[in-house]
Amino acid sequence: MTEIRLTNTKSRRKEAFEPIDRKNVRLYVCGPTVYDRAHLGNGRPVVVFDVLFRLLRHVYGEGHVTYVRNFTDVDDKINAAALARKDAGDPRSLEALIRERTDETIRWYHEDMDALGALRPTHEPRATEWIGAMIAMIEDLIAKGHAYEREGHVLFRVRSYRDYGALSGRSVDDMIAGARVEVAPFKEDPMDFVLWKPSDDELPGWDSPWGRGRPGWHIECSAMSYELLGATFDIHAGGIDLQFPHHENEIAQSCCAHPEGGFARVWMHNEMLLVDGRKMSKSLGNFFTVRDLLDQGWPGEVIRMVYLGTHYGRPMDWTAEKAEQAKTTLRNWAEMVEGAAPGEVRAEVVDPLSDDLNTAGALAALSDLYKRKDAAGLLGSAHLLGVDLQAIRHQPWARPYAFEELDGRFLREGIDYQPTVGVIGWGEITDQARETSIGLLHRWLALRRAGDFETADRLKTDAMRLGVELRAQKSPNGVTGGLAKLADRVDVSALEGLL
């Protein structure tokens, strides 16, 4: 059987992975707080640990891996968004507004992560569905002397857990010395953190032995992982930004509640994401959601390839140049596997993935299969990285095009300054498909000229889903026109519904 080696953040070493139970390998990844769209950095752990999930299934069998990724749907940011709606005059209850917001955000998240080719986890628990389990764990921590109640708050006694700081390599005293925050008067120790906090009548809350309130962030993952995976499981993963305090606090409360378990054996953290060499920030104007990039025309498969091009343990830099290179690579690979049947996953692709999830090395191995014209091996092996070349083959952006038909005259320098539109496709373009595509182009360009970019982006996304890529392009004399790329299978009647 293939040996997998993973870097364990806690031991700071690359270790041979040996599951507790080969018939049920268990993985927990911290999921999103569902108050807004997932940004580009949020997508990285999804793709990275999706590949880990696929690798574990490949080695141990699809039915022998349990993957849990949670949704945090109780949070002050969610409350603030709902309160803003209510203050703006929405007559519905705060509970209804919160539920609408979280349901909508989860739907967005699924749509965006599906576009990135990520498999759905085995379980996706919502925190609000496990409040009872959180209360039970808090009661247990109090009974064992690891937590205390003050003024409606329940706090974890950090100094009661002697190994606190082992994951992040910090000591409690150093953390206190470096702190620059005001300490709540009800805390016994500045490092103690909240397990439960009171809710006033305006905020969401649940009845508990300490009064009406809501859970702290850290207890949510501890309770849900225990209920779904047990006191001991194989791998806990997430972004490096969660290492402290979230994961450190998870370890403390879980190990104190269930000292017989030991919580997660292996801890994995992906590094942060940069954009053109700089930290992603709204103030720098380089902040993107996954949906922003999809709506700009970057296919989800291309975004995924850029993620995979850098080892998860190193910062990843998103650039348009990398995305264009990934697009070209995928187009070439998809063209070569035309008509091929998937072969077995090749060992030269499995080997780098088994060596601490070296996705860049696995992509290099796929490139070698392409160079050797091993279409079956390329097609089958790409699936292990979540790259479906057969599906990509039918995407408008990935097709080779046989000819071009233009509506209106060609633009000629100094002669014709009117915008024109073109339609290109694979094989014969029917009159109906050409006329419908031209109509969509004219409508899309008109919306852009009018400044209604939201409607224009929505039209472009809808057309792409139906097999037509709308693209603006300039002629040599600077006049903006448009081009529609048609896939080989286009539902023209559905397209007409967009006009």
Swiss-Prot record:
GO terms for biological process: cysteinyl-tRNA aminoacylation. Belongs to the class-I aminoacyl-tRNA synthetase family. PANTHER family: CYSTEINE--TRNA LIGASE, CYTOPLASMIC, CYSTEINYL-TRNA SYNTHETASE. The gene is cysS. It is found in: Cytoplasm. A motif ('KMSKS' region) lies at residues 279-283. GO terms for molecular function: ATP binding; cysteine-tRNA ligase activity; zinc ion binding. NCBIfam families: cysS. Zn(2+) binds at C30, C221, H246, E250. Monomer. ATP binds at K282. It comes from the Bacteria. This is Cysteine--tRNA ligase. Keywords: Aminoacyl-tRNA synthetase, ATP-binding, Cytoplasm, Ligase, Metal-binding, Nucleotide-binding, Protein biosynthesis, Zinc. One of its GO terms (cellular component) is cytosol. Its EC number is 6.1.1.16. SUPFAM superfamilies: Anticodon-binding domain of a subclass of class I aminoacyl-tRNA synthetases, Nucleotidylyl transferase. InterPro entries: Cys-tRNA-ligase, Cys-tRNA/MSH_ligase, Rossmann-like_a/b/a_fold, tRNA-synt_1_cat_dom, tRNAsynth_Ia_anticodon-bd. The lineage of its organism: Bacteria, Pseudomonadati, Pseudomonadota, Alphaproteobacteria, Rhodobacterales. Its cofactor is Zn(2+). Its main location: cytoplasm.
